[in-house]
Amino acid sequence: MFGNSRVPESVQGDIHPHLATLLDRHAGAPFRKPYADYNRAAFAGSLERWQRTAAGSPVILDSGCGVGESSLYLARNFPDHYVIGVDQSASRLARGRRSAAQWPPNLDLVRADVVDYWRLLREAGIRLDRHYLLYPNPWPKASQVSRRWHGHPVFPSLLDLSGVLECRSNWAIYLAEFCFAVRRMTQRPAVAESYAPDAAMTPFERKYLASGHR
């Protein structure tokens, strides 16, 4: 049911005991997975569109944007920014494009794997003004910690993109780990707090709010 979603269940009751070791390993060993050709092409295309339509505008990245509802929200609320929404699913992006009544000129939806897209941004020397990670897959099993973004070897590249970094989740442990990872890797403050927005930015957020999650 729409208003009956559950908080992720896990045997973990706190920050994963191996997360610090994982972070230290990733900090000392650059992630060298080869880029997929389709990700290179998608990145090059999005870079060309940004430079052609909004050169010099600060960039907001909406990673894992799904149907792009959050990207559309950001583009309308930050008209002086260029918003790039990235998702690996072509069908989700197509569904979002079809459902949008009006398409802002400062919005681009890109089909790509964010693991490659983040590294390509970093390699190109592009720095973000804002970066959103809205309700990423929490991978709640303790054995899946390395699949969470903060446990993934790409995490240092994500942090190198700078800007205001905002992550939302309905699992408190995910946010606690994310903040721990940011602090350990950057020596900068990161705070997790309860948040009840006036309007939902994503279908997941709408569902979680209807279920009373904070």
Report the location of each language-model feature.
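Conserved beta-strand signature within the Rossmann-like core of class I S-adenosyl-L-methionine
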Residues: 162-169
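Class I S-adenosyl-L-methionine
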Residues: 176-181, 185-214
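S-adenosyl-L-methionine
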Residues: 1-59, 70-76, 100-125
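Conserved beta-strand/loop positions that form the S-adenosyl-L-methionine
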Residues: 63, 86
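Conserved SAM/SAH-binding beta-strand->alpha-helix loop
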Residues: 89
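Class I SAM-dependent methyltransferase "Motif I" SAM/SAH-binding loop
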Residues: 64-68
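Conserved SAM-binding loop
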Residues: 96
